[in-house]
Regions:
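Bacterial N-terminal signal peptides that target proteins for export
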Residues: 1-9
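Cleavable N-terminal signal peptides
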Residues: 11-12, 22
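Sequence context surrounding c-type heme c attachment/ligation sites in exported
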Residues: 29-61, 67-151
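N-terminal signal peptide c-region/cleavage motif recognized by signal peptidases
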Residues: 17-21
Length: 151
C-alpha cells in the first residue's frame, strides 16, 4: 500500500504542475478580452475627467483624485496583452502595433507617465494644472488611437 502512495502522489503533483502551467499561458482571445476590458475601464474613468477639463461638470477634487488613481493603475495593464499571437483576432487593433512595436511602446510609456503626473497634480489642488494634464492624457490616447486603431 505504501509503495503506491509515492507514485500516485508524484503523478498528482506533476499533473497539477502541468495544469497550472497551461492556465498561466493565456489564449489570444482571452488576451483580447482582457485588454478590451482595460480600455473600457480607462474610458469610464477618463470620461468624467474630460468633462471636468472641458468645464461641462464642476471640478470635484475627490472624484478627480479617485479617477486619476484608477487611470494610473489601468495605464499599466493592457500592454502585454498586445501579444503577436493576438494579431489575427477580430479587433480594431491595426497590424502597425506589431510592425512598429517601438512606437506603440513609446505611447504606452507616455500614457503611464502622464497618468502618474495626473495623480501627483490631483493631490496638489491646482485645478488649472489638473485640467491641462487631463488634456495631455487625451492627446496621448488620441495619438495612439490615430496610429494604431482602426477608425
Amino acid at each position: 500500500m505504501r509503495k503506491n502512495i509515492l507514485p500516485a502522489g508524484l503523478v498528482f503533483a506533476l499533473g497539477a504542475g502541468v495544469s497550472m502551467n497551461a492556465l498561466a499561458q493565456a489564449k489570444p482571445d482571452v488576451m483580447v478580452k482582457q485588454r478590451q476590458a482595460v480600455m473600457t475601464l480607462q474610458g469610464k474613468y477618463l470620461g468624467p475627467l474630460v468633462a471636468v477639463a472641458q468645464g461641462k461638470v464642476p471640478y470635484n477634487a475627490a472624484v478627480v483624485q479617485r479617477n486619476a488613481g484608477f487611470l494610473d493603475n489601468l495605464s499599466r495593464m493592457p500592454w502585454d496583452t498586445f501579444d503577436p499571437s493576438t494579431r489575427n483576432e477580430k479587433t480594431r487593433a491595426l497590424p502597425a502595433i506589431y510592425e512598429n512595436s517601438a512606437k506603440f511602446k513609446e505611447y504606452a510609456n507616455r500614457l503611464e507617465n502622464e497618468t502618474s503626473k495626473l495623480v501627483t497634480l490631483s493631490r496638489g489642488g491646482d485645478e488649472a494644472a489638473v485640467k491641462a494634464q487631463i488634456g495631455a492624457i487625451g492627446k496621448v490616447c488620441g495619438a495612439c488611437h490615430d496610429d494604431f486603431r482602426q477608425k
